[in-house]
């Protein structure tokens, strides 16, 4: 069954005729060509598919596209504004908080969601907030350092 689903994606209106039960991950990657959102485990365990929905980090491999109707979705492609990296993206680069890069989009968006809800997290709060995101390269310590640095640069999660 085809539904008309309208939402905002990376600050732009989107209107799709699509099966509303289709996973947001596949709509983003296949239908809209936004491949920064990664398919990792398909079960919500790794965090590679994380996007922001109304500012909250969610796993797009578990979210049906009909669940984002009339909401704001942000992918890694929409995080930088006017060619300027978001403070979290900048901090990841400055702290060398990536290696292969596969987990990075999900890590960055999870961190943005965390800092939006908790602008001044402790290291322990960052660890808890990021524990559902996996990095097989072992960059976790640098990722936490980057998030702490970004928190210092950001004002109220923005």
What are the residue ranges of the model-derived segments?
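Signature of N-terminal electron-transfer/Fe-S-associated modules in redox systems
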Residues: 1-158
């Amino acid at each position: 069954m085809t539904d008309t689903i309208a939402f905002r994606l990376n600050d732009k209106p989107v209107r799709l005729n699509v099966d509303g039960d289709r996973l947001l991950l596949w709509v983003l990657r296949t239908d809209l060509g936004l491949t920064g959102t990664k398919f990792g485990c398909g079960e919500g365990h790794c965090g590679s598919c994380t996007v922001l929905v109304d500012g909250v980090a969610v796993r797009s491999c578990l979210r049906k596209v009909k669940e984002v109707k009339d909401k704001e979705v942000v992918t890694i492609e929409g995080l930088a504004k006017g060619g300027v990296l978001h403070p979290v993206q900048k901090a990841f680069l400055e702290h060398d908080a990536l290696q292969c890069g596969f987990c990075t989009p999900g890590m960055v968006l999870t961190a943005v969601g965390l800092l939006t809800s908790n602008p001044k997290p402790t290291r322990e709060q960052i660890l808890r907030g990021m524990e559902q995101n996996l990095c097989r390269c072992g960059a976790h310590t640098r990722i936490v350092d980057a998030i702490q640095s970004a928190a210092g640069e950001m004002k109220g999660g923005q």
